[in-house]
UniProtKB/Swiss-Prot annotation:
This is Biotin synthase. GO terms for molecular function: 2 iron, 2 sulfur cluster binding; 4 iron, 4 sulfur cluster binding; biotin synthase activity; iron ion binding. Keywords: 2Fe-2S, 4Fe-4S, Biotin biosynthesis, Iron, Iron-sulfur, Metal-binding, S-adenosyl-L-methionine, Transferase. PANTHER family: BIOTIN SYNTHASE, BIOTIN SYNTHASE, MITOCHONDRIAL. Its EC number is 2.8.1.6. Its cofactor is [4Fe-4S] cluster; [2Fe-2S] cluster. SMART domains: BATS (SM00876), Elp3 (SM00729). Pathway: Cofactor biosynthesis; biotin biosynthesis; biotin from 7,8-diaminononanoate: step 2/2. It catalyses: (4R,5S)-dethiobiotin + (sulfur carrier)-SH + 2 reduced [2Fe-2S]-[ferredoxin] + 2 S-adenosyl-L-methionine = (sulfur carrier)-H + biotin + 2 5'-deoxyadenosine + 2 L-methionine + 2 oxidized [2Fe-2S]-[ferredoxin]. The lineage of its organism: Bacteria, Bacillati, Bacillota, Bacilli, Bacillales. One of its GO terms (biological process) is biotin biosynthetic process. Residues 53-282 form the Radical SAM core domain.
Length: 332
């Protein structure tokens, strides 16, 4: 039987990264363009980097959708957008009591980080105060790390969230700057970068990632990883487009499981010390190879996403245990 020869020494590349030698954009593209038969070797190499920085720990995050739908923005991938016809639940803000209850559910699900998310372009000062009230109570009664994702922020709002005890702020870049106008016209790529920077300047750990599979090229996919490196995102959620019926991108071809694995590996090579989270689309796009993704990533969401269902927490706990990995509770 003819043996398949690998094109690159992926392990050597991984050890170079461990020794703090940054890979090039050409290296990142090579990972994404590698033959599918090489994917296990690539994931094994990515694990060398992952294990060096994070061992066998897996961080769990839980989302609460505190305000659903009713968003004036026209992001083509989003079922909560004003232009979406997807049949989702739409509701205004949950009470502070409900948000606090969600924190205790996060603990029951063994999550260490609780993500308070609200749809919309940007929060009003009154809405920020609403979140702050819940955050203060959660901080007083739990050891959870708190992440917020509320849309665009001004400097004052970012500062008040930091003062209240918000550890992390999520604002994804979503896609490559070259591709942004094709998915959204109501704000710009630079608007998103600006909010990440405002959160960081306020002393909040920045969380920013992308949604892969929205028409970006392979080269742009690699450049997204380097852009996230440039803005110094501490946590990088890797989402994979779920082409929801009723959204403008409903006909978009979704990435294959192997393509998703290559994205995760490439992201680990480019951002070796950062928390890399397998996020939206994990169950739908990775399917039966979900466990392999954790050889590059070190974080997942547990439970449901904003408008799509996740798998049962017990399934995630079992997957982590079956890999010989351990849940890292209450840690950023």
């Amino acid at each position: 039987m003819k043996q398949v020869q690998t094109k690159r020494d992926w392990k050597k590349l991984a050890y170079d990264v461990v020794e703090e030698k940054m890979i090039t954009k050409e290296d990142a593209i090579a990972i994404l363009e590698a033959d599918d038969t090489e994917v296990l070797e690539i994931m094994n190499a990515a694990y060398i980097i992952r294990h060096h920085h994070f061992g066998k720990k897996v961080k769990l995050n839980m989302i609460i959708n505190t305000k659903s739908g009713l968003c004036p923005e026209d992001c083509g991938y989003c079922s909560q957008s004003i232009i979406s016809e997807a049949p989702i639940d739409k509701y205004a803000w949950l009470t502070q009591e409900k948000i606090v209850e969600g924190a205790h559910e996060a603990i029951r699900r063994k999550a260490g980080t609780y993500c308070i998310v609200a749809s919309g372009r940007r929060p009003t000062d009154k809405e920020v105060n609403h979140v702050i009230g819940a955050v203060k109570e959660i901080r007083e009664t739990t050891d959870l790390k708190i992440c917020c994702c509320l849309g665009f922020l001004n400097e004052d709002q970012a500062g008040r969230l930091a003062e209240a005890g918000v550890h992390r702020y999520n604002h994804n870049l979503d896609t490559h700057a070259n591709n942004y106008d094709s998915i959204c016209s109501t704000h710009t790529y630079d608007d998103r970068v600006d909010t990440v920077q405002k959160a960081k300047q306020a002393g909040i750990s920045p969380c920013s990632g992308a949604i892969f599979g929205m028409g970006e090229t392979i080269e742009e996919r690699a450049e997204i990883a380097f852009e996230l490196q440039r803005i110094d995102a501490d946590s990088i959620p890797c989402n994979f487009l779920v082409a929801v019926k009723g959204t403008p991108l409903e006909g978009q071809k979704e990435l294959t499981p192997v393509e998703c694995l290559k994205v995760l590996a490439m992201m680990r090579f480019v951002n070796p010390t950062k928390e890399i989270r397998i996020s939206g689309g994990r169950e739908i796009n990775l399917r039966s190879v979900q466990p392999i993704g954790l050889f590059a990533a070190n974080s997942i969401f547990v439970g449901d996403y904003l408008t799509t269902a996740g798998q049962e927490p017990t399934a995630d706990w079992g997957m982590i245990a079956d890999l010989g990995f351990e849940i890292e509770e209450c840690a950023l």
